[in-house]
Amino acid sequence: MRNYYIPYDEKCKKVNYLYVLSLYKLAEVDKKTYLYNRISYDTIKDLTAKINSNYKESILSEATTTRYLQKDIYNRFYSVDTDNKVITLKNNFQKQNIDRINKFVIINDKELSFLMASNDTLLIAYYLYLKYYCGYSSSNKIDTTAKQFLEASGYSPKAGNYISKISDYNKILNDNGFIKIIKKRDNNGNERNEYYIL
């Protein structure tokens, strides 16, 4: 089973994770590093077609692909050699500074396929958030709220539609066997969710 090392950053509101995960799925092996971190392309049209081939419906236009390749927010995920038409993913966590090792989320083929099939970049961001904080905890759990996730990620924690979406995501992730949720009361008597990655 192949694992994918996704650089993690909470401030993900402007990140199109459908685009990012598609690049990870397309990556070929770099013979020097033995990592799946290399995407070669002939033209922007060719690259856009490759990215869109991972979805039932197109998620990008050629203009959007061009813009994303130039956009600073995606620098954390890859570097682009426009002369040789090669994208190199920044997924070599072993070469990162020790303080940055935990800035990765590791997902497998099953998780990648599920997240891409969701066609929902907010769901992807939410799952990576849970996985990041659970995956590197000795107890493999996180005690959090929808508002905490939204606030950390740059969304409005007061927006009712986002709160409702997170509730839906909890059910979807739980029903599909990715998380387990245990409800508990805090010291003030407020109900909170305790999340476990399965």
Residue spans for each PLM region:
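Positively charged, structured surface patches that bind polyanionic biopolymers
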Residues: 1-17, 28-38, 54, 89-118
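Short helix-coil-helix linker/hinge
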Residues: 10-19, 116-124, 129, 133-137
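Single-residue recognition of alpha-helix capping/boundary positions
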Residues: 16, 43, 111, 120-123, ...
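Cysteine-centered metal-binding/redox modules
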Residues: 22
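Winged helix-turn-helix DNA-binding recognition segment
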Residues: 26-87, 135-194
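A broad "ordered helical/assembly scaffold" signature
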Residues: 48-51, 109-122, 132, 153-154
